[in-house]
Amino acid sequence: MNAAVLLLLLALAALPASCAPPRSFRLELASVDASAADAANLTEHELLRRAIQRSRYRLAGIGMARGEAASARKAVVAETPIMPAGGEYLVKLGIGTPPYKFTAAIDTASDLIWTQCQPCTGCYHQVDPMFNPRVSSTYAALPCSSDTCDELDVHRCGHDDDESCQYTYTYSGNATTEGTLAVDKLVIGEDAFRGVAFGCSTSSTGGAPPPQASGVVGLGRGPLSLVSQLSVRRFAYCLPPPASRIPGKLVLGADADAARNATNRIAVPMRRDPRYPSYYYLNLDGLLIGDRAMSLPPTTTTTATATATAPAPAPTPSPNATAVAVGDANRYGMIIDIASTITFLEASLYDELVNDLEVEIRLPRGTGSSLGLDLCFILPDGVAFDRVYVPAVALAFDGRWLRLDKARLFAEDRESGMMCLMVGRAEAGSVSILGNFQQQNMQVLYNLRRGRVTFVQSPCGALR
């Protein structure tokens, strides 16, 4: 063999995993309650009730905050990620040499990858054994002077000889996780990636992930997220209904795609809001309920009116219907949150939606939902839930309409004899959240290079 060719092959073999040709990786998304110790005894009703309860707790953590930590060397004003208590879907990964296998909650609304580490002085209870960094031969704490450490909003220098990067990662609602920022080998299936930065947490307070999770894997748009560190340009997932015991799918890399010939496919541009730089943020233009256009409150600084001509799969509106497009995208934007089960609409939008649904459905309202939901209708005696009329609702994102049928809007509360809206009310002026109930049995593709999200209403089996 030619000596030059041999040297080239040796050089290519020595390249880190991040420099290798683009590949694809597939992970199973397990429902958090399917992994619970009492999973076998949980009914579909209880599975749904638990997911809704976690969503409400998670909502309480959305907001703006200034990260603060004792002896902080750097503190900047930025958005704080949503508190991790939602954690609806879990993935199995490995870290270190030899690989320590751990389970983590995935989160599209935060960036940091972290797991609890020994010795832990203030950790929440977890089912898996805790990672011991001293056992891993490839573990290395990052120095405080490193560029990676500078990516953290709040960090400080350790007091040991190497002045390791000590972080305080703050979620909204004053939930925090603290520890050492380090690098180690990350294992996804049969593939290993060297030098992946992650948080080795030794203290967590506030909203903790469920005990089935040893930490969190952030899939957000920031530099410390899994997709950013692996240079993944696209990823896709498909989620089963929240009360289902069937796992979902997550595909990272070039194979992540949505059916190109599907008639019920829409591609929506992702926007960047300076308040939420790590979130997958969509510009919410308006809503349609059946054939009726919903007028957004005239409380923004600028508005523009556009004819509501909706491509498939949106409901066909009246030719004269109009949807109000909001110029102030910061107020009426929506973030995609895989870890929240129900969708939350900004207060004024939610109130309008409720009023219009009451007019359309024409059933008596019920109270005291055992699921903990706000808007419920009493089902007529002898009439099955699947036979009750519910108008389709469409969300407008930059003029592209995402249709939500009854299965993605309402859930049956069998214990109360009602059907209840799987949409909640967020605070006035807050950002809206697109939850996973509205994304069920739908392929969701994130194309980070082109800056768009594609929704395809297709069974999860079609995502290979």
From Swiss-Prot:
Its EC number is 3.4.23.-. Residues 299-319 are annotated as: Disordered. The active site is at D107, D337. InterPro entries: Pepsin-like_plant, PEPTIDASE_A1, Peptidase_aspartic_dom_sf, Plant_Aspart_Prot_A1, TAXi_C, TAXi_N. One of its GO terms (molecular function) is aspartic-type endopeptidase activity. One of its GO terms (cellular component) is extracellular region. Glycans are attached at N41, N174, N261, N320. One of its GO terms (biological process) is regulation of programmed cell death. Residues 299-311 have a biased composition (Low complexity). Coiled coil: none annotated. Residues 1-19 form the signal peptide. Keywords: Aspartyl protease, Disulfide bond, Glycoprotein, Hydrolase, Protease, Signal. Disulfide bonds join C117-C123, C376-C420. Residues 89-456 form the Peptidase A1 domain. It comes from the Eukaryota. Anther-specific aspartic protease involved in tapetal programmed cell death (PCD). Directly regulated by the transcription factor EAT1/DTD in anthers during tapetum PCD and degeneration. PANTHER family: ASPARTYL PROTEASE 37 (PTHR47967:SF6), OS07G0603500 PROTEIN-RELATED (PTHR47967). Belongs to the peptidase A1 family. This is Aspartyl protease 37. It comes from Oryza sativa subsp. japonica. The lineage of its organism: Eukaryota, Viridiplantae, Streptophyta, Embryophyta, Tracheophyta.
